[in-house]
């Protein structure tokens, strides 16, 4: 059996995470939530806390901004990855201008994950459907 992959995409703050969480809970009693965000400012802290509060005890929460393939998972589990866009950004920031190395690392991790018989619900951003930042990323 191969991996089942479900993509959930939409604009910034469009309800993607809630939609994906509800889908995961319909598929299994205790899904795995693989969070990729890093808390770098107060806004992100509030958003992460809201996500944690919403999930509570039914979820097994794993926070991994980079090494998602190292997560201990049992065959057949439902895994929500939130968010693929942030995860990719984390790799690009970590490796700087070495785009080829970042892409190779991401591909290796996804190949490792998707080689398992699990269901993945992957949240990603539809770039261009969200707001425009008032300041440059650093």
What are the residue ranges of the model-derived segments?
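SAM-dependent methyltransferases
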Residues: 1-3, 78-81, 104-111
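Short, functional N-terminal and low-complexity linear motifs
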Residues: 14-21, 77-79, 111-120
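Helix-adjacent hinge/juxtasegments
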Residues: 54-102
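Short amphipathic alpha-helical segments, especially helix-boundary/capping motifs
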Residues: 24-26, 42, 83-86, 121-126
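Generic beta-sheet signal
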Residues: 4-8, 31, 77-86, 118-122
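Short, hinge-like loop/turn segments at secondary-structure boundaries
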Residues: 50-52, 79, 138
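Conserved P-loop
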Residues: 2-73
């Amino acid at each position: 059996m191969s991996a089942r992959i479900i993509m959930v995409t939409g604009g910034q703050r469009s309800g993607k995470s809630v939609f994906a969480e509800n889908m995961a809970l319909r598929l299994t009693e205790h899904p795995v939530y693989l969070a990729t965000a890093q808390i770098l400012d107060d806004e992100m802290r509030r958003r992460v806390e809201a996500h944690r509060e919403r999930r509570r005890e039914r979820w097994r929460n794993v926070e991994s901004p980079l090494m998602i393939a190292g997560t201990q998972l049992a065959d057949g589990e439902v895994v929500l990855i939130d968010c693929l866009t942030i995860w990719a950004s984390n790799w690009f920031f970590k490796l700087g201008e070495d785009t080829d190395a970042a892409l190779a690392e991401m591909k290796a991790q996804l190949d490792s994950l998707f080689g398992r018989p699990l269901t993945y619900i992957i949240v990603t951003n539809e770039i261009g459907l969200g707001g425009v930042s008032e300041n440059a990323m650093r």
